[in-house]
Amino acid sequence: MTGVFITLEGGDGVGKSTQSALLREWLEEQGHEVVVTREPGGSDLGQEIREIVLHRRGHIAPRAEALLYAADRAHHVETVVRPALERGAVVLQDRYLDSSVAYQGAGRVLDAAEIRDLSLWAAQGLLPDLTVLLDLDQAAARIRLDAARTRFDRLEAERADFHERVRQAFLGLAAAEPERFLVVDAGWPREVIAAEIRARAHVLIAAGASA
């Protein structure tokens, strides 16, 4: 594959959508084809799965939830991500397998290694070239969410201890793979964050162009 795969990760309320939009604008100005997508919900099937995992009323068993995310990932990678990469596009994706490890692994207290293995199997081993982790204290993130919304999905509505486990899991993943992750303080001004991300993306894309 000749494209570049960039994912944005972090807890709820950290500004992933904002940074994705800013990065897309910059990349398109540089002449790149950019595909912006998300998990769950980056395909027609994924939209249906998203409704179940985020908005269905009532309990979903943690293992069933993990499998639903994996099903979405398998279809999404096969039908959206890989075709875009194969034609040389830059794929900007809101959440990927690291979210499964953090939310279903740490948040739902499932085995993180099993969740990662399941995700890699679903994605046929596809890892991002760059993962941007927007890190923010969960209390500050909650203030942002409360200011922005009146309704919350099933994960956003979880308690503070759930979100703290998720945050620490993300930081652990970044520490384990520093070559793949860029960790940015999501409390910084958005233009400062965008500049950090652009600098790393520029190096990555330039290296690919010269390879």
UniProtKB/Swiss-Prot annotation:
Question: Keywords of this protein's UniProt record, alphabetized?
Answer: ATP-binding, Kinase, Nucleotide biosynthesis, Nucleotide-binding, Transferase
Q: Name one GO molecular function term.
A: ATP binding
User: Does the record's keyword annotation contain ATP-binding?
Assistant: yes
Has UniProt tagged this entry with the keyword Chaperone? no
| Documented EC number(s) | 2.7.4.9
Recorded hits in InterPro entries, A to Z, give: P-loop_NTPase, Thymidylate_kin-like_dom, Thymidylate_kinase
Q: Name the Pfam families for this protein.
A: Thymidylate_kin
GO CC field = cytosol
For the ligand (ATP), the binding residues are 10-17
> Which CDD domains does the record match to this protein?
TMPK
Picking any one GO biological process from the record gives: dTTP biosynthetic process
Spell out the reaction equation it catalyses: dTMP + ATP = dTDP + ADP
Q: Which family does it belong to?
A: Belongs to the thymidylate kinase family.
Described function: Phosphorylation of dTMP to form dTDP in both de novo and salvage pathways of dTTP synthesis.
Protein name, UniProt field: Thymidylate kinase
Task: State the organism of origin.
Answer: Clavibacter sepedonicus
